[in-house]
Every structure is written in C-alpha cells, then in structure tokens.
Amino acid sequence: MKKFTYFTSEFVSPGHPDKISDQISDAILDACLKDDPNSRVACEVFCTTGLVVVGGEITTSTYIDVQDIVRKKIDEIGYRPGMGFDSNCGTLSCIHAQSPDIAMGVDIGGAGDQGIMFGGAVRETEELMPLALVLSREILVKLTNMMKSNEIEWARPDQKSQVTLAYDENGKVDHVDSIVVSVQHDEDTTHDEIEKIVIEKVVKPVLEKYNLSSDNIKYYINPTGRFVIGGPHGDTGVTGRKIIVDTYGGYFKHGGGAFSGKDPSKVDRSAAYAARWVAKNIVAAELADKCEIQLSYAIGVPKPVSVKVDTFGTSKVDEDKISEAVSKVFDLSPRGIEKALELREGNFKYQDLAAFGHIGRTDIDTPWERLNKVDELKKAIEL
C-alpha cells in the first residue's frame, strides 16, 4: 500500500477584504510612481462596512487623488450597492511624509529596512512553482473571470480556495486529495446549484489543464452551506495579511514582510522578487530541481548582509559552487535589484500583482520571472 504525505495551499480572490486593501495600497503606489518614479511610499489600507481608511508615509512630487483611486478600485473588483460594501463608502486619508531618518539611509542606496526575504523555485509546473499554490490560484482566476463576465450570475467577489496534494515516497505529486472552494453568492441560489457549477465548470477544467484526475477527490464547496454576507461587510480587511497567498502557498519559507503599498526601496518587496529571480534561474539552469534563496539586509547598508542557497539535496553540483556563482552573476544591492527588475519603470502595475499573486505569474511579464541568467550561471560554474 502506498504511503503518502500531504501538502496544502490556499488562495483568495481580489474581492477578499485583505486583497481589497492590498490592491488599493498598490494602486496608490502605482499612481505615485507613474508621475514620480522616485516616490517613497509605505501605504496601508483598512476596509470595513461603509469605510476605507488609507494611512502611511508618502513622499512624492506628484498629486494623487486618494478617494478617486479607492472608489475606482472597488468598482473594478466588482462590489455593487446591496452587497454591504461598494464605492459609495466613506474614505478617510491619513498620509504623511517619510521619516527623514529613514530617507537618509535610502538616499545613499541602502536598504529601506532590515529584514530577511525568501524566494524559491521547484520543478512541479512549467513556471517552476509549487503545484498546490498554482491550482488554488487557477481555480479563483477562472471563478473570478466567470463572475465578471456574468457566466456565473450568482457569484460575488469574495472567494477562497484550498488544494491538498498527496505526495509519494519519492516526493513527487501522486494525486489531488481534496479541494475547498468558498464563494460568496446571492440570496436565491441553492447550495446544490453552487456545488455543481463550481465543480463542473470551474474546478474540473483547471484539473484537466494540468492533466490531473478529478476522480476520488474530496470536495468541500461552501462547506458552511451559506456565504451571502462577505467582503468587508463580513470581515475587516487590512493590507499585508495574505503574504503566503502572495508568494508560494507555504511551500517555501517567508520572511514575514508584506509587499503591497511599498515602493521598491523596501527590500521586503524588492528582495523577495530578487530571491525568486535567483532561485528560478538556478532551477532552470538545471543546477537543482528545487531551490530556496534567503537574503538579509540592514537598514542603510547597500549590500545584503547574507545570501543563503538551499537546494534540499536536489543540486547537481556542490551548493557552495552555486552560492559563488550567485554572487558573481546577480547584483543583489537594493539599487541593483531595482534596476535589473525594472521596479520603477512602470512596465507592469503593482496593483495587478496584488490581485492574483506576485510570484509565478504567466499572464504578466514580470522581470523576476525571466530566465535571463541561466547561461551566466552555467558559465560561472563552468558547466
């Protein structure tokens, strides 16, 4: 009899209260960077029934209309009158300038704060991401798109998913064990109808895309039986509370720092992107099948305090050689990261990353997903 171990990841939709906050924070960041690429932004959002509070520290030469940004984003996500939360809500702005004590360290190219950041890659999907996270995300991408196109008319914006995979004794995915989907809905739709549509029209097509069997899966669709009250009317939302959803679904470690609302001088964001970039190129170069990078920084210091490579026993060459190659190939200073990953260029919108995840995106050309260092890594290791 086969022995299995189990691993689970979850995901939440753009209409989840915490994700509303993340997207508003990043929409404000995008607005600042659009007209002033050197803006310093640390923006936090709190949303609840009938109210959005925007706070933080912003130093910029441009003007941003906070209320307009908030209302447009709520409309875009899909909240309408009658849902307990919509763009007619009150908006309170409590923003002031960045502390000069922080600015003096960042101005010379140093990190905006101390901290540890992680990034990883694993050979489970084409984009070298953990499969459980990818499946959880794909389910909600499909469900959200079907809601917005009115293909599923009863669905509302607040949605969650969770996928459990069974791994064999060799650490390979054997099958999907269980799937949880909770979707906010209108008053009139029955639980049986919701369950049928979610399984047949949303989940099964996603599984087919990845050549996974839908047989014998344990499904939990709206397991409480009712999910009418949702969004910020059901739960308060705050920026930065979905950091595992934003990254690897718990498959790799996380340093604890959130991304949204932070300009690229904040290494919580920029260095986490860089760690993914490094790890993905290592795996793509076939130096390992699985890789996790840890970076650490000190406030005001231009270079990382430490760089750690962990290949979990899957490396094809000595880990020390990989570490040496990383130090030769990648400039992991805050300014080096900003330049290499085009973090102030405006080629992508941070608010789009806040909606469906910052890592492993295939629908957006994010520089940290590019495999542009594979040959240099191989050359550095003399393969």
Swiss-Prot record:
The keyword Metal-binding applies. Keywords: ATP-binding, Cytoplasm, Magnesium, Metal-binding, Nucleotide-binding, One-carbon metabolism, Potassium, Transferase. SUPFAM superfamilies: S-adenosylmethionine synthetase. The gene is metK. GO terms for biological process: one-carbon metabolic process; S-adenosylmethionine biosynthetic process. L-methionine binds at residues 57, 98, 235, 266. HAMAP family: S_AdoMet_synth1. It comes from Fusobacterium nucleatum subsp. nucleatum (strain ATCC 25586 / DSM 15643 / BCRC 10681 / CIP 101130 / JCM 8532 / KCTC 2640 / LMG 13131 / VPI 4355). Belongs to the AdoMet synthase family. Mg(2+) binds at residue 18. This is S-adenosylmethionine synthase. It catalyses: L-methionine + ATP + H2O = S-adenosyl-L-methionine + phosphate + diphosphate. Its EC number is 2.5.1.6. Pathway: Amino-acid biosynthesis; S-adenosyl-L-methionine biosynthesis; S-adenosyl-L-methionine from L-methionine: step 1/1.
